[in-house]
Amino acid sequence: MAERIFLEVNIDGLDPLISIRSLSVQQSIFAHHKFDLVVPSASIEPDNEKLFDIIAELVGKDITIDWETGTFKENSQGTDASSFKGIITDVSVYNERGNYMNVRIQGASPTILMDGVPNTNSFSELKLKPLYESVIASNLVNKLQAEDNLSYAEKIPFSIQYNETDFNYMCRIMHQCGEWFYYDGQTISLGVKTGKELKLTPDRTGSLHFGFNLSGPVAQVR
């Protein structure tokens, strides 16, 4: 039997959003995760005059998207539950077929906070975790705490961040040291952490969609 998906969205300052028209979460390994959520305007505020004041305050707020599968929610026991935490960056309102309004809420993973103005810095005699902490010092540190799952334990003698965003710099340095640097939907990981095995069976694959694409080469092949 195919399993149902139970979905709940929580935004700071609002009641949980249960009535969802559409939701997509795109999780990339080497880029910021993105989400796109559409809900009926009435699920946020039935009064249209108050609605615009409320949604104007949503940008910058934290959002948590929880979903789990099971034939019945009370029987799922959290055996296949996932959660995504992000930051709202865009909010818009549109009218659908002239009958009702929808609110579109878009955003990204907290790593987007590291992708601001390009910086130029130099670092010396630091291991990767202290280096990361130095890089994020000018950001909202509490939103960028990372788990240390590093294998590379050597100090980096000298490194230059030249006209790079903090995110691009850390991606480059971690790659040079043979380490992973990614967001798993809830926390930033320095290095690879051990996760639980997920088994895909024919009755579950209807709720999952995996895709791959091939992008162009970095340098032209002659």
Question: Which residues does each PLM region occupy?
Answer:
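Short coil-to-beta-strand transition motifs
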Residues: 76-86
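Juxtamembrane "anchor/assembly" segments of surface/extracellular structural proteins
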Residues: 1-68, 83, 103-114, 122, ...
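Exposed loop/turn and edge beta-strand positions of beta-sandwich/beta-sheet ligand-binding modules
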Residues: 82, 101, 156
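Short acidic/polar inter-strand loop motif in beta-rich domains
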Residues: 71-74
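Short, solvent-exposed secondary-structure boundary/capping segments
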Residues: 92-107, 188-189
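Conserved hydrophobic positions within beta-strands
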Residues: 88-90
